[in-house]
From Swiss-Prot:
The keyword GTP-binding does not apply. One of its GO terms (cellular component) is cytosolic small ribosomal subunit. Keywords: Ribonucleoprotein, Ribosomal protein. Belongs to the universal ribosomal protein uS2 family. It comes from Nitratidesulfovibrio vulgaris (strain DSM 19637 / Miyazaki F) (Desulfovibrio vulgaris). This is Small ribosomal subunit protein uS2. PROSITE patterns: RIBOSOMAL_S2_1. The gene is rpsB. One of its GO terms (molecular function) is structural constituent of ribosome. It comes from the Bacteria.
Length: 271
């Protein structure tokens, strides 16, 4: 299992929180102290809590679940899109559309529209329309792609959400909580940890710190996927062995006992 070490966290500035005046008192248990007006996060706790979050991600994917990565702030967008794509998971890096999860049926209609437009441009069907209409459809497709591109293959709700900066992504947090979707989140000193199921106390503003955590969660997804495939392969192998095993011959029915020959009848001699 590829856990993140304290050395990696120190090198990427995970321990730097927000200014002391911009904090949520509920984060007090995860704060080591303050330096130059900046809260310093207790990395011993971060190391331990990251392992718990990592294992949750692995377990989710092992059991066939999918993870949605959410990070719409500028510092997180590239890392979230690249790493979620590498792991074969879903992601949202542009604006979080209200109802993305709680009104998923409507979102699916928009996804269907996006796929239809992509198909029209791919096979040339769009060329039947006038230039003005083509430009309108291009703008529509670009807009849908920006907001839904990372979830266009999501045909059901995810089983886990990984969020960078839950304070910023408060609408996504509310939707996950309403639907009972567990949340793993990089939680800075200005966040409310009570809203998060698996807190990773850490800097959610520094690009290097964000990349470290996002890549590690993507690795956890890949690890879970590999374990799931291995388990599936073993199950298939067991089924083949069972199918190939010779069936036990049915027990032979006991032959009926032979009847004893009848004793000859001796007639009494006449006197």
């Amino acid at each position: 299992m590829a856990y993140v070490s304290m050395k990696q966290m120190l090198e990427t500035g995970v321990h730097f929180g927000h200014q002391t005046r911009r904090w949520n008192p509920k984060m007090r248990p995860f704060i080591f102290g303050a330096r130059n007006g900046i809260h310093i996060i207790d990395l011993q706790q971060t190391v331990k809590l990251f392992r718990t979050a990592h294992d949750k991600v692995v377990d989710t994917v092992v059991n066939g679940g999918k993870v949605v990565f959410i990070g719409t702030k500028r510092q997180a967008q590239e890392a979230v899109a690249v790493e979620a794509g590498r792991a074969g998971q879903f992601y949202v890096t542009n604006r979080w559309m209200g109802g993305t999860l709680t009104n998923f049926t409507t979102i699916q209609k928009s996804i269907d529209r996006l796929k239809k437009l992509e198909a029209m441009f791919a096979d040339g069907t769009v060329n039947k329309y006038q230039k003005k209409e083509i430009l309108r459809m291009q703008r529509e497709m670009d807009k849908l792609l920006a907001t839904l591109g990372g979830i266009k293959e999501m045909d059901r709700l995810p089983q886990l959400a990984f969020i960078v900066d839950p304070h910023r992504e408060d609408i996504a947090v509310k939707e996950c909580r309403k639907l009972g979707i567990p949340i793993v989140a990089v939680t800075d000193t200005n966040c409310d940890p009570d809203l998060i199921d698996f807190v990773i106390p850490g800097n959610d503003d520094a690009i290097r710190a964000i990349k470290l955590f996002v890549a590690a969660i993507a690795d956890a997804c890949l690890e879970g996927d590999a374990m799931r495939k291995e388990r599936k392969g073993k199950d298939a192998e067991e089924e083949l062995k069972k199918a190939a095993a010779p069936k036990a011959a049915p027990a032979a029915e006991a032959a009926p006992a032979a009847e004893a020959p009848a004793a000859p009848v001796v007639e009494a001699a006449a006197e």
